[in-house]
Design a protein with these regions (language model features):
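Acidic, proline/glycine-enriched N-terminal capping motif
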Residues: 1-120
Length: 120
């Protein structure tokens, strides 16, 4: 399966909001990430049943700027979206068993996220 999201990738963790809930701090994703996640929904296909068997996840991130970014945070945001929008049942190691080939590159004119899911 191949999914292309033609939007500049955004991480989930770098600029979160801390709110108090019943006396305990809770970290919420930043507004830019929340907007990114909503925009991405239209590019993620709907599956009848989420994938629940081992896969290799390969993601190519093409960033709009050369600013340093954390590939781990990008990958976590992508996995969370794939679970939220019903592509993956979960993002634990029994389903996402490898992430071979994931990379970050620069493409000012065409920032995007290319997701490749291959069943093992």
């Amino acid at each position: 399966m191949e999914i292309v999201i033609p939007i500049n990738p955004v991480t989930k963790k770098n600029h979160g909001q801390i709110i108090m809930c019943k006396g305990h701090p809770i970290m919420l994703p930043s507004k830019p990430y929340q907007e990114y996640e909503k925009k991405c929904k239209q590019y993620i296909p709907k599956l009848e049943n989420p994938i629940n068997e081992p896969i290799n996840l390969e993601v190519h991130y093409y960033m709009e700027t050369r600013r340093k970014c954390d590939i781990t945070n990008l990958l976590q945001a992508t996995c969370d979206m794939l679970v939220k929008y019903g592509i993956l049942e979960d993002d634990n190691y029994t389903i996402v068993s490898s992430v071979n080939g994931t990379k970050v590159e620069y493409d000012k004119k065409n920032p995007r996220c290319e997701i490749y899911i291959q069943k093992k």
